């Protein structure tokens, strides 16, 4: 069953390779959530202010991986960044992504 889904939707994103190639992890949770635990080296830009930070993120010129608690807010942030022409991936939960890298 899972091999069928992989064939249908393609292979998953290789987040480890993206990070090794220089991708930036942006954690879009609140500062309080971020302080409670986060991926080492990630940047905290809450989803409610990410629109204001688009120009600065774009200037970095690197792919972005967004994370949050469950994947919902990181999905919203992905949409904002993608519409600005930034190469972006939704890493989902910060805890889940941390276990993949």
What residues fall within each predicted segment?
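Short cysteine clusters
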Residues: 68
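Short hydrophobic beta-strand that contains or immediately precedes a catalytic carboxylate
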Residues: 24-28
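Rhodanese-like catalytic fold shared by cysteine-dependent sulfurtransferases
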Residues: 2-21, 31-63, 72-101
């Amino acid at each position: 069953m899972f091999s069928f889904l992989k064939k249908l939707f393609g292979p998953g994103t290789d987040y480890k390779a993206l990070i090794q190639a220089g991708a930036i992890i942006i954690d879009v949770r609140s500062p309080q959530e971020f302080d409670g635990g986060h991926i080492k080296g990630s940047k905290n830009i809450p989803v409610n202010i990410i629109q204001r930070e688009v120009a600065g993120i774009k200037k970095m010129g690197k792919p972005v991986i967004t994370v949050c608690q469950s994947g919902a807010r990181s999905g919203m942030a992905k949409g904002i960044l993608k519409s600005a022409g930034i190469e972006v991936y939704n890493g989902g939960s910060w805890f889940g992504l941390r276990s993949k890298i």
